[in-house]
């Protein structure tokens, strides 16, 4: 998959993506991932402003939340259309003084950013679109400030795609194929996306000189609720249930998305709250 092809997908799909984030499933993905992230954020210090980087920031939904916490945030994306939406959203939120917009390719972080510059790095729903996710993680590792800095990665979970095909779509052939597939088809942008397992994630983090300190599941059951349950009206209850499921080892492995938190490999390994 070429970088240009990916850029075109994001550029042409920017408005559709913004609309998706307003739907319950889009809100849940963003809200749950951010709630998980808050458990691992470095402590804010009055005398020091933390610096964050959002790789593949999209419309800036998560980055702007970090800016509201007082962080200085660099928003990096390959799509000018996405960055335009992020800029407008930042203006509406009144945080333009806290953000820097940067057009660039996630696989070229080492040439775009100074080393040891960021306390928090996000890479949410980016790696599944790329042929070389290790290049992104190597660049992110280089950009982490020190052993206390945190990297949050959100990816599409292979097990979740099996359940989606079988339960939501009722397509047993695709479900069976997804049991071993490295790639699947997605509908938002159109085209293929990489599927990850816990083992494959551990391997690419290790290759990037990073150590995973925790894994969380994002959207474990919400996608499969019957029609009588309104995702809009019952949003808060669904959110709270998902939060409880996200760290439970018997449930999280079948979530639609897997969220990993990592530090530089020399850091001590300890789970969060």
What are these regions, as identified by a protein language model?
Residues 1-56, 61, 65, 85, 150-179, ...:
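Conserved class I S-adenosyl-L-methionine
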Residues 122:
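A conserved beta-strand element that flanks and buttresses the S-adenosyl-L-methionine
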Residues 134-150:
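A short glycine-rich, Lys/Arg-flanked "PGG" loop and its adjoining helix->strand segment in the class I
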């Amino acid at each position: 998959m070429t970088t240009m092809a990916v850029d075109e997908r994001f550029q042409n799909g920017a408005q559709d993506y913004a609309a998706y984030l307003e739907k319950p499933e889009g809100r849940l993905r963003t809200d749950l991932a951010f709630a998980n992230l808050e458990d691992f954020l470095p402590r804010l210090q009055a005398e020091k402003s933390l610096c964050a980087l959002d790789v593949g920031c999209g419309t800036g939904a998560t980055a702007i939340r970090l800016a509201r916490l007082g962080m200085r945030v660099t928003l990096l994306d390959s799509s000018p259309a996405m960055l335009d939406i992020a800029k407008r959203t930042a203006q509406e939120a009144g945080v333009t003084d806290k953000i820097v917009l940067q057009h660039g390719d996630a696989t070229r972080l080492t040439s775009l950013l100074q080393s040891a510059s960021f306390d928090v790095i996000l890479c949410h729903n980016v790696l599944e679109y790329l042929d070389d996710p290790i290049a992104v993680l190597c660049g992110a590792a280089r950009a982490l400030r020190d052993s206390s800095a945190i990297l949050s990665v959100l990816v599409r979970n292979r097990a979740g795609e099996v359940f989606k095909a079988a339960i939501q779509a009722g397509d047993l052939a695709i479900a069976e194929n997804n049991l071993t597939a490295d790639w699947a088809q997605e509908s938002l942008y159109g085209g293929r996306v990489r599927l990850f397992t816990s083992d494959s994630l551990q391997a690419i983090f290790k290759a990037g000189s990073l150590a995973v300190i925790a894994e969380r599941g994002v959207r474990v059951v919400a996608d499969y609720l019957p029609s009588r349950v309104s995702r809009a009206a019952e949003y808060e209850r669904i959110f709270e249930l998902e939060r409880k499921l996200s760290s439970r080892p018997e449930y999280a492995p079948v979530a639609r998305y897997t969220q990993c938190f990592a530090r530089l490999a020399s850091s001590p390994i300890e789970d969060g709250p």
